[in-house]
Amino acid sequence: MIQERLNEIARSVFDDDSLVLTSSSKAADVPGWDSLAHINFMFSVETEFGVQFSDDEFVGFEDIGDLTSMLARKLQT
């Protein structure tokens, strides 16, 4: 469920309907994922899931799997 929603957000932010993020996907794997796109993606994630990330969390995940785990923890609290 989280992964599907992240894919929907990524497709919108990166304007690529064929984009599929996996748990091992990193920013470097996605064409156009630069610092500005990262900010747009993360703000969109915060809005979609109704969560807020700390500064460290905002930039501290290695791959989509890390982001998914972080979101799951936030949604449980």
Residue ranges of predicted features:
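Phosphopantetheine-dependent thiolation modules in NRPS/PKS and related acyl-activating systems
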Residues: M1-G32, A37-T77
